[in-house]
Amino acid sequence: MKKRIWFNRTFSTAYHFIDMIRTNPDGLDFEFYVTHPKRYSVMLQNADVAEIEPSLSIPEYIEYCVQFCQKHQIDIFFPNYRLVEIAKHIDRFEQVGTSVLVCKDADLLETVSDKGKLFQALRDTPGLHLPDYFIVNTSEQFKIAYEKLREKGHKVCFKPASGEGGAGFHIIEEHMNPLDKLLGSSNQTIAIEEVLSIIGDQIVDDIMVMEYLDDWEYSIDCLATEEELIAIVPRKKVEGRIRLLEDNQALIDLAKAVHEQLRLPYLFNVQVKYKNGVPKLLEINPRASGGLHSSCLSGVNFPYLAVKLLLSGKVEVAAPKFGVYATHIEKEIVLRQLL
C-alpha cells in the first residue's frame, strides 16, 4: 500500500524533493499530497492530489493541518510553513496516525529561528566562529551598534533577527549618492542616515546589526538523528548560479559542532560566509534548504533518506561524492490543471 506524503506551503524547488522521493532506490511507492495558497504554484503540478491552502490564523492553520492529515489519512507530513507551531502540536498529528518530519522540540526551533537567540545559544561552541553583532530595537541602539562595528574596522550590514533567507538584508554604505541607489543595480545598499530616519522614534522588532562578511558563502546540508550526524554536504556559491559540492573538512567539522550543541534531527542547513579565511555563521535552517536538490548530486538522496529515517529510525548512507560543479537552467512546465 502506498504511503501518503503531504507537503504544505513551500518553495518551488521542493518540486525536486517529490521527484527524488518518488524515484527512491528502494522502489517504495508514495502518493503525494500538496497544498499551496497560490493556484499557479508549480508544486501543485507535481502532486497526485492538490488543493488550495486557505489563509488562516495560526490556531486555525494548525486545526486545518490536523484535519487535512486525518481526512486524507496522511502517513508523513513534510512541513515547511509554520514549523514551530506544528512542532508544538506534534501529539495531535500522532493521534491521527501522521508522522511529522520536524524537530519535536518547539523551544529549540524557536531559538534556531531567531538569529539573536541562536547566536547566544552557540556563543561558547568550540570550533564555531560568530560574526561581531548587536541586536537592536531603536534608532539610537542602531547608531551605537553601527559606530562600534565601524571602530573595529568592519563594513556593516543588517537584517531582521527572525528573517528568512535574504529578506530584509542591507549593506550600509557611507557617503552614498541617492542617485546611485535609485539607478544602481543593487537594492541592498542603504545609507546610515536613511536607516536611522526610517526607524525614527519607533521600537521595532529585533534587528541584527553585524560585520559584513565579504568572502565565499556556503550552505551545509545535513541529515541527522538527535544522536548522530549521518550526512554532511558543503555547497559553495561559486558565482551566479554555479555551485560546487566541496570536501571542506573545516565546514564538516563546523556542522558537527553545531549538531553536537543543538541535536537537530532529520534535515537542517547551516549557512556560513568566510572573512579573512575564517568561516562565520550566518544562520541555521531547521528544515530542508531551498537548494537541497543540488546537494543530492553528491549521491545522497536527502529528501528520501529523511523520510526513511522518520519511518524506520535508521538509514545507510554512502560517502558523498564531492568535486561536483552544478548549475541549473530554466525549464518550461505546462500547468496541466488549475484549481
Show which residues each predicted segment covers.
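Short, charged, surface-exposed secondary-structure boundary motifs
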Residues: 43-44, 61-63, 108-116, 166-167, ...
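Active-site nucleotide/adenylate-binding loops and adjacent lid/helix of ATP-dependent enzymes
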Residues: 109-206
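ATP-dependent carboxylate activation and anion-phosphoryl transfer catalytic cores
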Residues: 8, 72, 238-253, 257-339
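ATP-binding N-terminal substructure of ATP-dependent carboxylate-amine bond-forming enzymes
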Residues: 1-103
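Residues that mark the start of a beta-strand
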Residues: 2-6, 155, 208
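A short catalytic or substrate-binding loop motif that flags glycine-/basic-rich loops and adjacent residues
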Residues: 150, 162-164, 212-216, 263-265
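Phosphate-binding site of ATP-dependent enzymes
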Residues: 182-258, 262, 273-274, 278-280
